[in-house]
């Protein structure tokens, strides 16, 4: 163990760390050179003062540098949320990923098990016969052959094991609760990313800009969800050409109706999988409209659609033509063969 982190903990409590200082601090953490007390001290100093964009970018850059990387085709994007919104909705970002892939955009989706939901993305994919616990080689095969791959965080970020026990003991949100969407192992340059609070969308968008993203939408629903909501207004921080612009979006902007929140509440993994299969079959529902809205946004970010209405049409075609279902079946086959 090293004492190099001690002065940085004190500095972090008093003032924002420079990007170089933050990179040094997180390198020490990820190299396993900090004690549990030092890790907790740094994380709580940052949380209490409030993390800066430079600190987010530094932590994410170090985490990316130490990950088990994936080579993704040009133009691949991520569709992901921070999780932690506590709303227990149906699996919207996961379904969106398959619909967007069915529309011809390669999706390199990064995620983890969602401890705040009855059924996270890993649970839904398991119900659909997809093995999420695969390494970079299998993910690369899936991206190239199926046009979609899922990267489970523990399989790609082994260095975070050094901080997990302390995070569990702290039992509160820290910088690590937002690092997942900022540390895609495939290094994608385009993202549709949900945040559990509106306050994070601009700083996360600015962080992705510092990390080299070309275009990204950071979103939060007015109902508290970490995605574009079908129940009313959503807030968006849109990164494009190095600048961030904040806008409000409404389902009607995409030609979609508003639905009550109760219509998108999820259940057990089995119940959510049943809803997902019905969506793939083309059944009309609030769930379908929520997925169409988010898929439309992703297709705009990917430059596949000029606006949300065109994106909705492309997303609906992906579902109704069977292309979205074909992506589920292809990913299941490739990942099961890897067992």
Curated annotation (Swiss-Prot):
Function recorded in the entry: Catalyzes the transfer of the phosphoribosyl group of 5-phosphorylribose-1-pyrophosphate (PRPP) to anthranilate to yield N-(5'-phosphoribosyl)-anthranilate (PRA).
PANTHER family: ANTHRANILATE PHOSPHORIBOSYLTRANSFERASE (PTHR43285:SF2)
Binding of anthranilate 2, residues: 167
Cofactor: Mg(2+)
Cellular component GO terms held in the UniProt record: cytosol
Quaternary structure, from the entry: Homodimer.
Positions of anthranilate 1 binding: 81, 112
Cofactor note: Binds 2 magnesium ions per monomer.
E.C. code: 2.4.2.18
Family: Belongs to the anthranilate phosphoribosyltransferase family.
Organism: Ruegeria pomeroyi (strain ATCC 700808 / DSM 15171 / DSS-3)
Biological or metabolic pathway of the protein: Amino-acid biosynthesis; L-tryptophan biosynthesis; L-tryptophan from chorismate: step 2/5
Binding residues annotated for Mg(2+) 1, in chain numbering: 93, 227
Protein name: Anthranilate phosphoribosyltransferase
Positions annotated to bind 5-phospho-alpha-D-ribose 1-diphosphate: 81, 84-85, 89, 91-94, 109-117, 121
HAMAP family (alphabetical): TrpD
SUPFAM superfamilies: Nucleoside phosphorylase/phosphoribosyltransferase catalytic domain, Nucleoside phosphorylase/phosphoribosyltransferase N-terminal domain
Lineage of the organism: Bacteria, Pseudomonadati, Pseudomonadota, Alphaproteobacteria, Rhodobacterales
């Amino acid at each position: 163990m090293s004492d190099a982190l001690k002065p940085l903990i004190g500095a972090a409590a008093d003032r924002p760390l420079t990007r170089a200082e933050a990179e040094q601090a997180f390198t020490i953490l990820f190299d396993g050179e900090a004690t549990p007390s030092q890790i907790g001290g740094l994380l709580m100093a940052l949380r209490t003062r409030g993390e800066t964009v430079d600190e987010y970018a530094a932590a994410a850059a170090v985490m990316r540098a130490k990950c088990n990387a994936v080579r993704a085709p040009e133009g691949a994007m991520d569709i992901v949320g921070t999780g932690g919104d506590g709303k227990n909705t149906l699996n919207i970002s996961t379904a969106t990923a398959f619909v967007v892939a069915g529309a011809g955009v390669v999706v390199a989706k990064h995620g983890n098990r969602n401890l705040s939901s009855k059924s996270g993305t890993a649970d839904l994919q398991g119900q659909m016969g997809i093995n999420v616990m695969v390494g970079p080689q299998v993910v690369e095969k899936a991206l190239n052959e199926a046009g979609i791959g899922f990267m489970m965080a523990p399989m790609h970020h082994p260095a975070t094991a050094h901080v997990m026990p302390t995070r569990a003991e702290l039992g509160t949100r820290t910088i690590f609760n937002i690092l997942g969407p900022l540390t895609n192992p495939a290094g994608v340059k385009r993202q549709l990313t949900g945040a559990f609070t509106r306050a994070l969308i601009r700083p996360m968008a600015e962080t992705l800009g510092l990390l080299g993203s070309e275009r990204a939408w950071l979103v939060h629903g007015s109902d508290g969800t970490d995605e574009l909501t079908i129940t009313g207004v959503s807030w968006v921080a849109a990164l494009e050409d190095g600048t961030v612009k904040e806008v409000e979006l409404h389902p009607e902007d995409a030609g979609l109706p508003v639905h009550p929140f109760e219509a998108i509440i999820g259940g057990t993994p089995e119940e959510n999988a049943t809803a997902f299969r019905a969506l793939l079959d083309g059944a009309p529902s609030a769930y379908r409209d929520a997925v169409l809205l988010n898929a439309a946004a992703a297709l705009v970010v990917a430059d596949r659609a000029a606006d949300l209405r065109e994106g909705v049409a492309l997303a609906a075609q992906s579902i109704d033509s069977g292309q979205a279902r074909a992506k589920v079946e292809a990913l299941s086959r490739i990942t099961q063969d890897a067992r």
